[in-house]
């Protein structure tokens, strides 16, 4: 009995010592701000499930007010979802790998009442190796690896299966530096409604699985020195309805990166395009393969996409080097209309296409939903060629967003349809194999200019540049690769060289809540609003005699052509005492927009000037970037959406 007591006492002493050592280690780690997962029980042997230890380290760092979770060299199997916490960064040391596992230990996909607006993978976020919602100050730094290990699902996962490595929603302040992600299932990274994202030296290799990084509804993003190889889309910018709202996107820069997409798109906008996109800059990028689009930009669900700029980009082995398309899918929960694409520039681009059918294409819709304001400077594209002559009629459109949604283009080089204000300067297109089609065909456009444009002429091509129903085209100093003057053919078109071209129709729309909203103006939810939200002032705030010094929404917008514009707002003015705003364009004088037609439902109203007998406000705008500001005047007035158009007879509709 006494021996057993002594043994028990010895064990108790050892336990006390171990506990004390653990406490000292934990206290030391906390003090240093670094939490080593091995101190919390991780084995790193590649076979034991280290998820619990990793989670303990995360929780300890969070309890300490934030810190770094260190992953030392070793292979750490993680068979359960790790729940991220604010102000916690993972540091993966050289030689460290966190690997996924088979089985059903991951969090099940949550329910989502908005499933019908995007596919399963985009609609669910919990079913991931790492998940977080409404977090701030989180990150992953390398040079270690997170590897799904071939265990993550590329289709729709069953309960307990994961289909992504990193899944984040409604986060702010994400850092991804130097870490490598491999075999990510459907997504290596899925972020939705996150802002202030920075990434340097991120490496993704998910060519055996599906997507690299889906950046959805994001603002203020900087990506440098990324290397992303994917099977589906490599780096893609989207805006869906998975979070139950139409959300803005913008202020994005990607530089010094390499992208590859084995089956699909390398650098892509869409197809999910509910919210508007503005201010994107891509520079010094190499793309080495894309079986769909190299540079793809589509608006399928009502998005207005503007101010997108590509510079110093080299593409090889891409089926469609450049593709812009406006579609009419309208798969978004806010009953969207048809979108716009405007103010897009391509500078110093060299591309080699890999499909004779998917010629570089700009495809807009008729009416006010055309592509506009696109410039190409020093853009040189080589396509496979190899087609014979064919009809020059408009190809079929199956309504999809991919390059193969359109039939074989009647031009081997550029095909433009419903595109206005497009300019090519010092650019060229040629083929690898003789082709009987013209180099360029433009159909139903305005103000198309080709200056210093070089084409290769096929032996059976009837002409080099063709214009069909184009109002205002100009071709100067265009030649073939042999030095001969380029042949131009036109039908139902007018040349505009040396004349002032007719104005193009420009219509820009934007959500009121997409601007910079300052107190006491506030964003409120309403499912009947076009984006699910609107802007109004907090009750009790009125400023009838003059515009307030604060309390407004400042909405940026860009117009592709100079001219006189009319302003519209989608509003609710419940009574005659709640029917006004202060409005100004850029830093101009304030206008008292009063006497808005009263109604308890959303409706469009022209912005008018109360001091000028309620005449419509018609500012003269230069082409380029502007702002429109709405400040409060009477509480109760609500603003959902704005529209700026140079079609002075246009009346917006829902």
Predicted regions and their residues:
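Extracellular/periplasmic carbohydrate-active domains that bind, remodel
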Residues: 3-11, 17, 23, 28-501
């Amino acid at each position: 009995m006494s021996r057993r007591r002594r043994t028990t006492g010895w064990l108790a002493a050892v336990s006390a010592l171990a506990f004390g050592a653990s406490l000292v280690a934990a206290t030391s780690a906390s003090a240093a701000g670094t939490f080593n997962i091995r101190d919390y029980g991780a084995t790193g042997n590649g076979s034991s499930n280290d998820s619990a230890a990793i989670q303990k380290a995360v929780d300890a760092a969070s309890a300490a007010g934030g810190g770094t979770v260190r992953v030392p060299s070793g292979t750490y199997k993680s068979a359960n979802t790790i729940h991220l916490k604010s102000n916690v960064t993972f540091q993966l040391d050289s030689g460290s790998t966190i690997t996924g596992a088979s089985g059903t230990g991951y969090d099940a996909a949550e329910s989502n009442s908005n499933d019908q607006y995007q596919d399963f993978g985009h609609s669910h976020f919990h079913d991931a190796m790492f998940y977080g919602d409404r977090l701030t100050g989180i990150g992953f730094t390398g040079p270690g690896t997170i590897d799904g290990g071939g265990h993550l699902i590329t289709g729709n996962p069953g309960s307990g299966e994961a289909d992504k490595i990193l899944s984040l929603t409604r986060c702010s302040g994400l850092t991804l530096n130097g870490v490598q992600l491999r075999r990510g299932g459907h997504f290596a990274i899925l972020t939705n409604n996150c802002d202030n994202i920075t990434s340097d030296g991120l490496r993704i290799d998910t060519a055996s699985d599906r997507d690299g990084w889906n950046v959805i509804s994001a603002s203020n993003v900087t990506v440098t020195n990324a290397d992303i190889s994917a099977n589906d889309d490599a780096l893609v910018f989207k805006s869906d309805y998975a979070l139950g709202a139409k959300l803005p996107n913008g202020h994005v820069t990607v530089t010094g990166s390499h992208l590859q997409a084995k089956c699909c798109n390398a650098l892509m906008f869409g197809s999910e395009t509910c919210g508007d996109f503005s201010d994107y800059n891509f520079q010094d990028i190499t793309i080495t393969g894309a079986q769909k689009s190299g540079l793809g930009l589509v608006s399928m669900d009502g998005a207005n996409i503007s101010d997108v700029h590509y510079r110093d980009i080299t593409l090889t082995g891409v089926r469609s080097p450049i593709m812009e398309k406006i579609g009419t899918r309208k798969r978004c929960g806010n009953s969207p209309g048809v979108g716009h694409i405007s103010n897009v520039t391509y500078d110093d681009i060299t591309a080699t296409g890999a499909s004779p059918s998917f010629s570089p294409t700009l495809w807009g819709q008729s009416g006010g939903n055309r592509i506009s304001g696109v410039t190409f400077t020093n853009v040189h594209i080589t396509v496979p060629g190899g087609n014979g002559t064919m009809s020059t009629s408009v190809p079929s459109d199956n309504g999809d967003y991919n390059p193969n949604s359109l039939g074989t283009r009647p031009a081997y080089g550029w095909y433009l349809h419903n595109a206005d204000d497009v300019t090519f300067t010092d650019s060229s297109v040629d083929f690898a194999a003789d082709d009987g089609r013209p180099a360029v065909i433009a159909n139903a456009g305005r103000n198309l200019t080709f200056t210093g444009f070089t084409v290769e002429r096929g032996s059976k091509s009837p002409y080099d540049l063709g214009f069909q129903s184009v109002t205002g085209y100009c071709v100067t100093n265009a030649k073939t690769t042999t030095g001969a003057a380029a042949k131009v053919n036109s039908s139902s078109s007018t040349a505009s060289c040396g004349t002032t071209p007719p104005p193009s129709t420009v219509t820009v729309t934007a959500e009121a809540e997409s601007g910079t909203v300052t107190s006491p103006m506030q964003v409120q939810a309403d499912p009947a609003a076009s984006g699910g939200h609107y802007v109004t002032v907090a009750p009790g705030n009125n400023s009838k005699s003059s515009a307030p010094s604060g309390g407004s929404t400042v909405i940026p917008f860009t117009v592709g052509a100079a001219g006189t514009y009319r302003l519209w707002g989608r509003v609710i003015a419940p009574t005659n005492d709640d029917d006004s705003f202060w409005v100004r364009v850029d830093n101009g004088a304030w206008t008292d927009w009063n006497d808005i037609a009263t109604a308890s439902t959303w409706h469009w109203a022209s912005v008018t000037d109360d001091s000028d007998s309620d005449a419509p406000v018609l500012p003269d705008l230069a082409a380029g970037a502007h702002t429109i500001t709405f400040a409060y005047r009477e509480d109760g007035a609500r603003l959902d959406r704005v529209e700026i158009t140079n079609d002075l007879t246009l009346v917006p509709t829902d």
